Amino acid sequence: MSGELPPNINIKEPRWDQSTFIGRAKHFFTVTDPRNILLTNAQLEAARKVVHDYRQGIVPSGLTENELWRAKYIYDSAFHPDTGEKMILIGRMSAQVPMNMTITGCMMTFYRTTPAVLFWQWVNQSFNAVVNYTNRSGDAPLTVNELGTAYVSATTGAVATALGLNALTKRVSPLVGRFVPFAAVAAANCINIPLMRQRELKVGIPVTDENGNRLGESASAAKQAITQVVVSRILMAAPGMAIPPFIMNTLEKKAFLKRFPWMSAPVQVGIVGFCLVFATPLCCALFPQKSSMSVTSLEAELQARIRETYPELRRVYFNKGL
């Protein structure tokens, strides 16, 4: 074996300490880096080769640790962790900021008429469906029926919320009306994510001890995981949908946007994008990817099995998802 690197760097785990918020934030700033969507197929395949070779104990001569980690994050950004298949471009985590800034900016610009609300809420939920399908579990893949049910339900919920609130806010200030899209997105997340992961709520998700030894499946762990994801998704959208209304409400009274009203959408998209560049990774980092809960919070049957085999165990761990 040749090369400068030791063969025992654990590239299956993130580079930074995931028990701290700072470590998780660094990880997600790298994972959601929009520049990764500009990488060519040749660059993606080169990163895949470096990762696969290293996992097999082959260390290319001259490869540095920074280059190895860069290859690992490029690989993770484009290939499914379970199946190894290349993911749909707009479904990758690196596409979240550019896609969401465009869709969110347009939702918040064109919110006054029913056709515009219908169209942009439909676009947003269609994008969410692509993301959820792209990042589906390889062990328990989504069925077409589950995906369709979640898609239709979330779209209906978002549109109903937006149209209902639009009707209620017609008699209040224009500023209040600008927050309708955020309420619609929050409502859709509360519908979409639990429906998309309904199988986990029924049969549970794998729980392990600290060393990764599988102990069983828990629906209680699934509830905690899904709640954390819903909270982080809503908070992720909040800065990009709560800050721009104040800015745009002021800017649209200025001479520039009165003279060039068509500039409202590009300006709004830019403001939303600036917010999302920071909000996306920071809100992904709110909760550890490897979450934990007390054994006493599990189902009685699973508690009994764990106490029988591991009487000293106090906490179990599980992957919360994204």
UniProtKB/Swiss-Prot annotation:
This is Sideroflexin-1. It is found in: Mitochondrion inner membrane. It catalyses: L-serine(in) = L-serine(out); L-alanine(in) = L-alanine(out); L-cysteine(in) = L-cysteine(out). Pfam families: SFXNs. The modification N-acetylserine is found at S2. Belongs to the sideroflexin family. Residues 2-102, 168-174, 250-266 are mitochondrial matrix. It comes from the Eukaryota. InterPro entries: Mtc. Its main location: mitochondrion. GO terms for cellular component: mitochondrial inner membrane. It is a multi-pass membrane protein. GO terms for molecular function: L-alanine transmembrane transporter activity; L-serine transmembrane transporter activity; monoatomic ion transmembrane transporter activity. GO terms for biological process: L-alanine transport; L-serine transport; one-carbon metabolic process; serine import into mitochondrion. Amino acid transporter importing serine, an essential substrate of the mitochondrial branch of the one-carbon pathway, into mitochondria. Mitochondrial serine is then converted to glycine and formate, which exits to the cytosol where it is used to generate the charged folates that serve as one-carbon donors. May also transport other amino acids including alanine and cysteine. Keywords: Acetylation, Amino-acid transport, Membrane, Mitochondrion, Mitochondrion inner membrane, One-carbon metabolism, Transmembrane, Transmembrane helix, Transport. The chain crosses the membrane at residues 103-120, 147-167, 175-195, 229-249, 267-287. Residues 121-146, 196-228, 288-322 are mitochondrial intermembrane.
